[in-house]
Curated annotation (Swiss-Prot):
Reported function: Mitochondrial intermembrane chaperone that participates in the import and insertion of some multi-pass transmembrane proteins into the mitochondrial inner membrane. Also required for the transfer of beta-barrel precursors from the TOM complex to the sorting and assembly machinery (SAM complex) of the outer membrane. Acts as a chaperone-like protein that protects the hydrophobic precursors from aggregation and guide them through the mitochondrial intermembrane space.
Name assigned to this protein: Mitochondrial import inner membrane translocase subunit TIM8
One annotated GO molecular function: metal ion binding
The species this protein was found in: Candida glabrata (strain ATCC 2001 / BCRC 20586 / JCM 3761 / NBRC 0622 / NRRL Y-65 / CBS 138)
Membrane topology recorded in Swiss-Prot or TrEMBL: Peripheral membrane protein
SUPFAM superfamilies recorded: Tim10-like
Quaternary structure note: Heterohexamer; composed of 3 copies of TIM8 and 3 copies of TIM13, named soluble 70 kDa complex. Associates with the TIM22 complex, whose core is composed of TIM22 and TIM54. Interacts with the transmembrane regions of multi-pass transmembrane proteins in transit.
Length: 87
């Protein structure tokens, strides 16, 4: 990471400031997605995996995980669409 003097931020053009703001918004959005994925993984793992005794999932565990993740993804898609429609 570069060492940027905070005073230099005032020297940026409006276009550069908008570009930086857009970049930061995109990075924040990516972080939110990563956080959601981590939460889904944790919740679904706890819900579907009762014990880890080898490197394979049972067919029931695979089905549970797929269903769990799909349910969260469907819910998120609906929430995002609802937010987009309300804007």
């Amino acid at each position: 990471m570069s060492n940027l003097n905070p005073g230099e931020l005032g020297d940026l053009t409006d276009a550069s400031k908008k570009e930086i703001a857009a970049y930061l918004d995109a990075e924040n959005s990516k972080q939110k997605v990563r956080t959601s994925i981590n939460q889904f993984t944790d919740i679904c793992f706890k819900k579907c995996i009762s014990r880890v005794d080898n490197g394979n999932l049972s067919s029931q565990e695979e089905e549970c995980l797929a269903s769990c993740v799909n349910r969260f993804l469907d819910t998120n898609i609906r929430v995002v669409r609802g937010l987009q429609n309300s804007q």
